[in-house]
Each structure stands twice: as C-alpha cells, then as structure tokens.
Amino acid sequence: VGTRVVVDPLMGPGDMLGTNRSGAYAEYVVVPATNVFPIPDTLGFEEAAALPTVYQAEDVQPHDFDTDRPYLTYTADGETHRLDCDFIAGCDGFHGSSRQAIPEQVRTEYEKTYPFGWLGILSETPPVDHELIYANSERGFALCSMRNANLSRYYIQCALSDRPEDWEDDTFWTELKRRLPEDTAEKLVTGPSIEKSIAPLRSFVCEPMRWGRLFLCGDAAHIVPPTGAKGLNTAASDVHYLYHGMVAHYQDGESEGLDRYSETALKRIWKTQRFSWSMTNLLHRFPEQSEFDLHVQAAELAFLAENEAAQRALAENYVGLAY
C-alpha cells in the first residue's frame, strides 16, 4: 500500500506573522497541510490481494499474545469468530482492548489533562484564509483551517463544562471573530454548522508498546493534544517501525526491529509529546496564569515571529520529525 500513497499537498509559503492589537497578541503559524492517501486506494489493495475485511466487528479481544500462537476473537453478524495470528497490531484507539490486555504490573501510563477543551464546528463556507491560522488572544485560543474551497473547520478554546448545545452558531461566530485580528475577522464568512463537538485535551503515553506478540500503534499507545497536529503523524511513524520490523522478520529472519519496536517508537513519541505540550502551553490561556506567565508567553510568540532558527525548529516539529 505504501507504494501507492497519493499526496495532495495544500502548500503555503511558510511565513509566520505576529500581530499585536488592543493588548492581545495573535500569532499565525503557517505550514503545509497534506492529505496522506484516500481510502479507496487501501480498499483497492485489499481487493487485489483477495484479503477479507471485517467491518462492524464487536468485542474484539487479543489472546495468548505472550506465546508464539496468539489469536483474536470477535463477534460479527451475531457469531463469535477466531483469527489465528503471527502477530497482533493493536490499532484500536484509546478506548480499545489491546492496551488493557497488557498486564497492569508491566504497563506504565503517563497522563496529563488540560483545563479546557476545543469547541469545533464544520461549516459549508469558504475558508477565511487558504493558510492554517493559530490565534492566541486575551479571550483564548482559536484555530482556522480549510477542508476544501467550500468547507471550513474552526475551533475555539472553551471550558470543559461547556456542551455543544450551549453554543448557538451565531454565538460561536461572534466569539471566533473576537479572537482574530480585525482584518481577518472582517473576511470571515459565517453560516450554519453541519457538525459541532467539544474535545477535551490530554497528553498520554503507555509503556511498553509491545508485550509478547502484541504491538500497540497510534492512539492505543499515546494521545497528544491537537495543538501540534501530531496524532496521525505519530500513528504513521508507529506503523512505519512495525512494518519494517515485520519485513525484516519475514524476509530475513531478523527479529531486532520487532524486539526494539517499543524503544524506537517511544523515542520519537516523547519528542512529539514535548512539541504538542509546548504548543498547547504557548497558544492557550490557562486559569492559573499570572501576569508573569502571560508576559513570558507573549515573549515566546514574539521570538518565534522574529527568529528564523526558531521558525525552522517549529516547522520541523510541526511537519513531523524524520522516521
């Protein structure tokens, strides 16, 4: 499948601009956005290889992964099925069964929660800009992004106690405009939302990411706050390391890649966690922030806007560290 990846970049010039208005500091960070590959390509590969795909499976459970004969059980169409495996890749998300199957006495979980969420809407409106916009204002964080020429997604920082139904569309648009510079707010095209949700923010890592023949990938092993846009990127790096480990195992009879999977993946994950955590601290307003904290935050934003080396470091981390 990797040889058929279709890349459709929405490239920007990579500028970073800072605007100081009415005592509020708004920061723009502009980076390329890339669609990895369309789902039909993956489905076409499965069809060509005559591989069965089971959708809507329930109660998926890994078994005996500490032996050389692991297997999965799952329920589909009202019947229980068994799938014998060489290895199990646990790609079932934060709430899946894979991580929980690793014994508690060998599993260490690190977690940090944040005192706010992101209220996001999707609207069939042209984007306010073809570039991604991050804004840190005295009223809190805001993000403007495009899905296509007539579909936009916007986010604002909100209280964890808020509910989507608490926010009428007009209230959301008014608050978003307040968090953007006037010239940007004036260009904002508003309209009815077609989707509205609130996402809490957390940082999470599980160690190890391998136990026996069970390998954790993506959200099953780690969560990052969306500020750094590293969730899918980090999941892809996990799959990269696991894929190459399996290729070496099956083609060359080597086990080093699989044996070192957890160690290798975690080195990159913690760097990604650091970046996502730092971006979250940089761009949000925290309830406990002092005037000193706010001045340091503003100074960091100004430094990023003015210093090319800092911009390069941010861009390298935002696009994704090499793997």
Identify the role of each PLM range.
Residues 200-216, 220:
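FAD-binding beta-loop-beta segment adjacent to the flavin cofactor pocket
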Residues 97-98, 223-225:
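Catalytic P-loop NTPase motifs of RecA-like helicase/translocase cores
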Residues 60-201, 206:
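Conserved FAD-binding catalytic core of PHBH/FMO-like flavoproteins
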Residues 91, 218-219, 237:
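Active-site flanking residues adjacent to catalytic metal/cofactor-binding acidic residues
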Residues 226-236:
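A conserved FAD-binding loop/helix module that cradles the flavin
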Residues 8-58:
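NAD(P)H dinucleotide-binding glycine-rich loop of Rossmann-like/cofactor-binding domains
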